[in-house]
Amino acid sequence: LADKKGATEFLGYTSLTSEAIVADILVEGKAVGSAKAGDEVIICVNQTPFYAESGGQVGDTGVMRWADASAVITNTTKTAGLFLHHARIDNGTLVPGQAVSLDVNGSRREALKAHHSATHLLHEALRQVLGDHVAQKGSLVTDTRLRFDFSHPKAMTNKEIAAVEAIVNDRIRMNSQVLTKIMTP
């Protein structure tokens, strides 16, 4: 699909809403000509404010609307530059070429952003307390929690845990401006 339709333009660093055009609708990996109420589908659009699952962070959720119809976006993933909106059609019929309005669940996005930033603060605090050998080995960032997997040769002591917690809390209280920087592996 990416070769035929081109990559999806991501607008989500500056907006939680956008207009878009449906490029394709997929059911079980195959393109279909339409989707109706009750269908579970993947919708590809030309541009989106929905952040796709990446680097341990879950994808955005929200709503897609058109005419007098809507779909609930239950997850967003990405492959080969295409953002895939996993959705359930609530009512109406959706067809490729349809103009739609996209609306990200803003309160959930804010919680995801906070936990994403917290992973960076936690990593730096761990390196300060335990040493430069600490490396991130994985993570899970959701709207309700984060998990941070890291390398260290032994269990942390209560004193080390308290020191890491104090550093992270001090940084949070600083309420520093957050800058978006796209990092490549």
PLM feature spans:
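A glycine- and charged-residue-rich anion-binding loop/surface
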Residues: L1-P185
